[in-house]
């Protein structure tokens, strides 16, 4: 169910590192694992634009509320253009009557500025209801010659019966019953029941109520806070959306868009903020995520409510919307938060066709608390939000009463606050009878695009004024779009047959998947095409528009005669074996032989390449790595320039042969800088600056720049002062989709992004507090938290873990039992002492344990050491952590006995010493008592022995040999430099170690150890100091975040950021350095090792050869590619991965030939299994191996090769600090580096290719 309300498509996060289809539910909110078996075919399609996401669009600004409805025109009739209609413009005739409304105000309450409760969410299948007696001649299909038709209603003729209210449309809402004021149910115990959801929500029809006055709502409970909310007519803020693309999307148990109710939660964190809670959730979504957060000022929706979230346990998650109340601390803020929550809850109930029905006392209803879910449904044991509400002298019954009142107001059943009467319900909806047309302005423009009508749609409209559309079977086909029309807040496309031009009708924007298209061009080109490839009657055609399939065996010749670009894809029309049709260029291979291009001489125009020059209005930043500045585009080489990472104006664009150039100049003067190659700049379109006269507020410390979209090299100064300062803007320019303003603040002038500016709020009148006193909520001042350095083992029998020492009841701590953790904090509370346990990497807090549940020892400071040891025959194994238990062993004692252990650091634990180092390609801790320092042995010539390890060739000037130590049979390593070398034998000859193994071309050879490296590390100079980049990050509007205690996110300090960005420090850590691992570089991990890791992973088992081939073909790190496939397939168990066929547009799982899709490519949310299998079938993926190799190309281009190819670059973007970063958590790259390191450890390998930025 697509919803239209301030929707923004979320930014795609390129990294998919961890997770599986079966993920643990929220540690704090639900402790059992959800069985997603029934939802295996509902995939999270974060790699593609799902069709449901494409239906989302932002609702236009509310138009004026005008009395009346539109005149209905039969959509089946297309009126021909009459002879006297010379212009073809849509005609509007106006007839206006005066409507009157009883304006009496509600008793004991003052009239307020707005008598409506706005609907926060809506979608469109019906024409918008309007409220003016106006008759319009419909805009007809044939009346489309004039692309600028406008219909205006004379505002002087309109006498509004009410103040402005939002015009919105809605569907899938339930028909309201008679006006009721449902009270909370009696507190009686009953047998737990299950709420069932109707298979279909009937459209609700609400006409203007015939009564002249609606009844006031009669509260069912006494509440001073609710009275305060009502008296002051508190308004709920607009719902913000902060969706995260990598959150999983699973249907509710009744299907997508069918929740059965809403659950009230509170965050249980007295010190957090709404931003902190959301940031924490995003970084820990594998444990829990909810739909929305509410505080006193904001409502932020964090996940689409059409899909379930993980917030209330395995039983409740498939049923309910989960919303968290963020703690506030004063009377007014708490009241606003209750108002905001009630408004959001009422909006959800109304939108999904549900009525308020409290489940608190009988386990049956639509409004639940977390406590009620625990009591009646199980799967969780939490009791919120009762404790938090009580702390503010409030109760769930009062909140439910407020939700019920809000709902009835929205449904037009009781009078809105501040008024006694109304003639229309506040929720605009489908009118019961046709009346007058929309009063919105009509604009029509030419369009040259294509569209596919969705299966669920509002129908075809003969005119854009029609109340309803006519049902159509022309769905999931590609049509040409020739016109775009906007009427009020509705947008329509005029669709027509692509080949004949026959018009079908108007469709609503939300009912189609639309793509831009360029005009077709004639071509004359031959390609090769594989047999079985589908040809289509139209470009971007669907399964309903197949013209035929390529016959024959072996590649066939496709002769293309026409080409068209749809969005960013190229389609060609041509003939093959007597069949003609369209096909994507991705399925064609150019058979033309490449023609060598003559090398142009410097400053001499080439005679073979055509030069085209055109004017351009844009801006560009020259990359740090570039080909220099060119005086003319004919120059062979450019001149080096220091003008990098600065913003310049672009005035010209030139194309010469296969190269494209931009002419850059100083933004503020006529000075030309020179020509630069397109690939050497980051370019953005720019509109011409316009003069403005506007005052804003800006925070102190905000940077001003000498140019719009300026860099750190173009800072004009920073805003001084304390508190918000006044910024007087005089000029504005749009760069790409961002707005920049030039102005002055405190004597300094410069450009600043509009995102950092705020319009000054109008002064508000003080509102008197209600007389009802609120009891003081006091807490005994706790003792000071002490920082300690200790280590602890959790006892098998323990009382559990707490998020805070103030929690009276601990959560189950069984999963931490008999394991060792670092201890960083200690605090006494009452008569008990608690310590904060951190994970094995020191820096991620897990929670607080009572010291009675632990065995604690002092932990010394880690000291570097470089020493080789022999592991004793009797030993305790290699552990993840010093003093680790049997549950934390990486390699058992038998696996490392008498092996060589290379130590790099040591630490004392109590009276023992533990050393950290490497053995058998694995790193971990060994007790010093289990090690013996070997005596020095003089190197001697030895016989060749088996040795399995993959090195990297580091010396391109070295040689490989047929036999070791041969001076004659040797060959250059230049062609194999920086490539893997899989060693199988080792031999020492005269003190020189030789390795025998396989080169990347499959040839076996001997190579000296001095020409090999265990890893290849490259260092890149950033041109900046660590202080500079840390200052940029710390100065961002959305500050980097740090978590010092569990669940509490705070703005990171400058030193936190600098510490997290310190590449020298990170590179020294064996696990943290994996944030520099290149994800776009395969490293030839052996097929046997991959297969061993994939054992038990469903259809991915024994697919090591396919992953190896895919990594080599498309340049992707094997570990990253495997992790992506495991996530998408639920460890190889999803139906999409196991395979199926699509026959007659239906999924068949028992067919002889099955098609597989292991990366979820094209598995659109509206029907992921069918769409994903269709894509796989079209691609010919009839084996799992083909799906792995074929899908890897998409993964490589869409994720790894998007530019930021390491975790460090994804988090900090050292090339452009502060822009396009994937997280705010300063520890994000560290966490994911350890996860990837963990995969390597499980496979028994180590990373080979690292790219480390260096600061001056």
Curated annotation (Swiss-Prot):
Renumbered to this chain, the Polar residues biased-composition regions fall at 103-138
Give the chief site where it resides: secreted
What keywords does the record list, in alphabetical order?
A: Cell wall biogenesis/degradation, Hydrolase, Multifunctional enzyme, Repeat, Secreted, Signal
Which catalytic reaction applies to this protein?
A: Hydrolyzes the link between N-acetylmuramoyl residues and L-amino acid residues in certain cell-wall glycopeptides; an N(4)-(oligosaccharide-(1->3)-[oligosaccharide-(1->6)]-beta-D-Man-(1->4)-beta-D-GlcNAc-(1->4)-alpha-D-GlcNAc)-L-asparaginyl-[protein] + H2O = an oligosaccharide-(1->3)-[oligosaccharide-(1->6)]-beta-D-Man-(1->4)-D-GlcNAc + N(4)-(N-acetyl-beta-D-glucosaminyl)-L-asparaginyl-[protein]
Instruction: Please name the InterPro entries in this protein's record.
Output: Amidase/PGRP_sf (IPR036505), Amidase_domain (IPR002502), GW_dom (IPR025987), GW_dom_sf (IPR038200), MGlyc_endo_b_GlcNAc-like_dom (IPR002901)
Q: Which Gene3D superfamilies match?
A: 1.10.530.10, 2.30.30.170, Peptidoglycan recognition protein-like
Chain ranges passing through the membrane? none
Region of interest called Disordered, as start-end residue ranges on this chain: 103-151, 172-214, 419-440
Family matches, as PROSITE patterns: GW
Q: Any idea of its EC number?
A: 3.5.1.28, 3.2.1.96
Signal peptide span per the entry?
1-29
A GO CC term assigned to this protein in UniProt: extracellular region
Q: How is it modified after translation?
A: Undergoes proteolytic processing to generate the two extracellular lytic enzymes, probably at the septal region on the cell surface.
Q: Which GO terms describe its molecular function?
A: amidase activity; mannosyl-glycoprotein endo-beta-N-acetylglucosaminidase activity; N-acetylmuramoyl-L-alanine amidase activity
Supply the enzyme class, top level. hydrolase
Residues covered by the GW domain: 443-517, 519-593, 612-686, 688-762, 784-859, 861-936, 943-1017
A GO BP entry is:
cell wall organization
Q: Where is this region: Endo-beta-N-acetylglucosaminidase?
A: 776-1256
What's said on domains? The GW domains are responsible for directing the proteins to the septal region.
Function noted in UniProt? Endohydrolysis of the di-N-acetylchitobiosyl unit in high-mannose glycopeptides and glycoproteins containing the -[(Man)5(GlcNAc)2]-Asn structure. One N-acetyl-D-glucosamine residue remains attached to the protein; the rest of the oligosaccharide is released intact. Cleaves the peptidoglycan connecting the daughter cells at the end of the cell division cycle, resulting in the separation of the two newly divided cells. Acts as an autolysin in penicillin-induced lysis.
> Subunit info?
Oligomer; forms a ring structure at the cell surface which is important for efficient partitioning of daughter cells after cell division.
Specify the protein name: Bifunctional autolysin
- Organism this protein belongs to: Staphylococcus aureus (strain NCTC 8325 / PS 47)
Gene designation: atl
């Amino acid at each position: 169910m697509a919803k239209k309300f301030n929707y923004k498509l979320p930014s795609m996060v390129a990294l998919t590192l961890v997770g599986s289809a079966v993920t643990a539910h929220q540690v704090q909110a639900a402790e059992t694992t959800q069985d997603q078996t029934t939802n295996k075919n509902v995939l999270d399609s974060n790699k593609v634009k799902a069709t449901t996401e494409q239906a989302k669009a932002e609702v236009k600004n509310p138009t004026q509320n005008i009395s009346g409805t539109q005149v209905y025109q039969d959509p089946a009739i297309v009126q021909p253009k009459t002879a006297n209609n010379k212009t073809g413009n849509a005609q509007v005739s106006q007839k206006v009557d005066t409507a009157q409304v009883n304006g009496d105000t509600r008793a004991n309450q003052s009239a307020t500025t707005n008598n409506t409760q706005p609907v926060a969410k809506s979608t469109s299948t019906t024409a918008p209801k309007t409220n003016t007696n106006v008759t319009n001649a419909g805009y007809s299909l044939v009346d489309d010659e004039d692309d600028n038709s406008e219909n205006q209603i004379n505002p002087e003729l309109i006498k509004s019966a009410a103040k402005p209210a939002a015009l919105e449309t809605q569907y899938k809402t339930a028909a309201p019953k008679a006006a009721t004021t449902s009270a909370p149910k009696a507190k009686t115990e009953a047998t737990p029941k299950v709420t069932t959801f109707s298979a279909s929500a009937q459209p609700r029809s609400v006409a203007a109520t015939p009564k002249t006055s609606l009844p006031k709502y009669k509260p069912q409970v006494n509440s001073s806070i609710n009275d305060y909310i009502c008296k002051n007519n508190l308004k709920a803020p607009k719902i913000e959306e902060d969706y995260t693309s990598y959150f999983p999307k699973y249907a509710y148990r009744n299907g997508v868009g069918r929740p059965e109710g809403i659950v009230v939660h509170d965050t249980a964190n007295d010190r957090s903020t709404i931003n902190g809670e959301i940031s924490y959730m995003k970084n820990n979504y594998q444990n829990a995520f909810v739909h929305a957060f509410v505080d006193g000022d904001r409502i932020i929706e964090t996940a689409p409510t059409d899909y379930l979230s993980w917030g209330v346990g395995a039983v409740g998650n498939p049923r309910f919307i989960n919303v968290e109340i963020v703690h506030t601390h004063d009377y007014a803020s708490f009241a606003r938060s209750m108002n905001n929550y009630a408004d959001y809850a009422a909006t959800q109930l109304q939108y999904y066709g549900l009525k308020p029905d409290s489940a608190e006392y009988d386990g049956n209803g639509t409004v639940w608390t977390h406590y009620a879910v625990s009591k009646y449904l199980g799967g969780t044991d939490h009791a919120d939000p009762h404790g938090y509400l009580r702390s503010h002298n409030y109760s769930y019954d009062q909140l439910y009463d407020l939700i019920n009142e809000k709902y009835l107001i929205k449904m037009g059943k009781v009078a809105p606050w501040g008024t006694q009467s109304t003639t229309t319900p506040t929720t605009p909806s489908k009118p019961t009878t046709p009346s007058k047309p929309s009063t919105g302005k009509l604009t029509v423009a030419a369009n040259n695009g294509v569209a596919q009508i969705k299966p669920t749609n509002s129908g075809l409209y003969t005119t854009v004024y029609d109340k309803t559309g006519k049902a159509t079977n022309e769905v999931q086909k590609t049509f040409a779009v020739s016109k775009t029309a906007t009427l009020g807040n509705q947008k329509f496309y005029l669709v027509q047959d692509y080949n004949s031009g026959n018009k079908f009708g108007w469709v609503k924007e939300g009912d189609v998947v639309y793509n831009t298209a360029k005009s077709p061009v004639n071509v004359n080109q031959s390609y090769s095409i594989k047999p079985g490839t589908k040809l289509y009657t139209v470009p971007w055609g669907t399964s309903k528009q197949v013209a035929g399939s390529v016959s024959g065996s072996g590649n066939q010749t496709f002769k293309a005669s026409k080409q068209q670009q749809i969005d960013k894809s190229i389609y060609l029309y041509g003939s093959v074996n007597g069949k003609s049709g369209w096909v994507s260029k991705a399925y064609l291979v150019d058979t033309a032989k490449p023609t060598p291009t003559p090398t142009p001489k410097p400053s001499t125009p080439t005679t073979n390449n055509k030069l085209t020059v055109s004017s351009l209005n844009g801006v560009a930043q020259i990359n740090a790595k570039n080909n220099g500045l060119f005086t003319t585009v004919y120059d062979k080489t450019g001149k080096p320039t220091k003008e990098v990472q600065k913003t310049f104006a672009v005035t010209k664009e030139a194309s010469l042969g296969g190269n494209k150039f931009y002419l850059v100049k100083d933004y503020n003067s006529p000075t030309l800088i020179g020509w630069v190659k397109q690939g050497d700049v980051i370019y953005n379109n720019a509109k011409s600056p316009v003069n403005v006269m506007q005052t804003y507020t800006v925070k102190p410390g905000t940077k001003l720049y000498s140019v719009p979209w300026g860099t750190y090299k173009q800072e004009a100064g920073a805003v001084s002062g304390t508190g918000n300062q006044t910024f007087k803007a005089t000029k504005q320019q749009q760069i790409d989709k961002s707005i920049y303003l030039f102005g002055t603040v405190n004597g300094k002038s410069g450009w600043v992004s509009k995102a950092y500016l705020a319009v000054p709020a109008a002064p508000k009148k003080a509102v008197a507090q209600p007389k009802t006193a609120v009891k003081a909520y006091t807490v005994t001042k706790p003792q000071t938290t002490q920082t300690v350095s200790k280590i602890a083992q959790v006892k098998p029998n323990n009382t559990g873990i707490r998020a805070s020492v103030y929690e009276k009841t601990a959560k189950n701590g069984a999963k931490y039992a008999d394991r060792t953790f670092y201890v960083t904090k200690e605090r006494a509370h009452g008569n008990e002492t608690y310590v904060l346990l951190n994970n094995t990497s020191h820096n991620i807090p897990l929670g607080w344990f009572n010291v009675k549940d632990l065995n604690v020892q002092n932990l010394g400071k880690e000291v570097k050491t470089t020493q080789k040891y022999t592991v004793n025959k009797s030993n305790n194994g290699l552990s993840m952590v010093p003093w680790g238990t049997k549950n934390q062993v990486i390699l058992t004692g038998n696996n490392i006995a008498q092996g060589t252990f290379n130590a790099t650091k040591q630490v004392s634990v109590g009276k023992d010493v533990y050393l950290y180092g490497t053995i058998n390609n694995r790193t971990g801790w060994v007790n010093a008592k289990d090690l013996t320092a070997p005596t020095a042995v003089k190197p001697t010539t030895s016989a060749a022995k088996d040795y399995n390890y993959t090195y990297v060739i580091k010396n391109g000037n070295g040689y490989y040999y047929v036999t070791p130590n041969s001076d004659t049979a040797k060959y250059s390593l230049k062609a194999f430099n920086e490539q893997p070398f899989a060693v199988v034998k080792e031999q020492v000859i005269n003190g020189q170690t030789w390795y025998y193994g396989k080169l990347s071309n499959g040839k076996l050879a001997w190579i000296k150890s001095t020409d090999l490296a265990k890893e290849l590390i490259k260092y890149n100079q950033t041109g900046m100091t660590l202080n500079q980049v840390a200052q940029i990050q710390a100065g961002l509007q959305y500050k980097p975040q740090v978590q010092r205690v569990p669940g509490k996110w705070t703005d990171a300090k400058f030193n936190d950021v600098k510490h997290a960005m310190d590449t020298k420090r990170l590179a020294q850590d064996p696990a943290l350095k994996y944030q520099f691992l290149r994800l776009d570089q395969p490293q030839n991990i052996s097929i046997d090792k991959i297969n061993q890791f994939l054992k038990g992973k469903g259809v991915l088992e024994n697919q090591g050869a396919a992953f190896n081939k895919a990594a080599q073909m498309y340049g992707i790190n094997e570990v990253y590619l495997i992790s992506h496939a495991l996530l998408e397939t639920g460890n190889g168990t999803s139906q999409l991965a196991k395979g199926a066929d699509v026959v007659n547009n239906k999924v068949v799982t028992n067919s002889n030939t099955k098609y597989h899709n292991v990366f979820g490519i094209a598995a659109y949310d509206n029907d992921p299994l069918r769409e994903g299998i269709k894509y796989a079938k079209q691609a010919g993926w009839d084996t799992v191996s083909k799906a792995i190799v074929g899908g890897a190309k998409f993964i490589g281009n869409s994720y790894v090769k998007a530019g930021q190819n390491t975790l460090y670059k994804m988090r900090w973007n050292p090339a452009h600090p502060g822009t396009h970063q994937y997280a705010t958590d300063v520890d994000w790259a560290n966490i994911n580096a350890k996860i990837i390191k963990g995969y390597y450890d499980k496979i028994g390998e180590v990373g080979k290719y690292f790219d480390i930025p260096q600061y001056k």
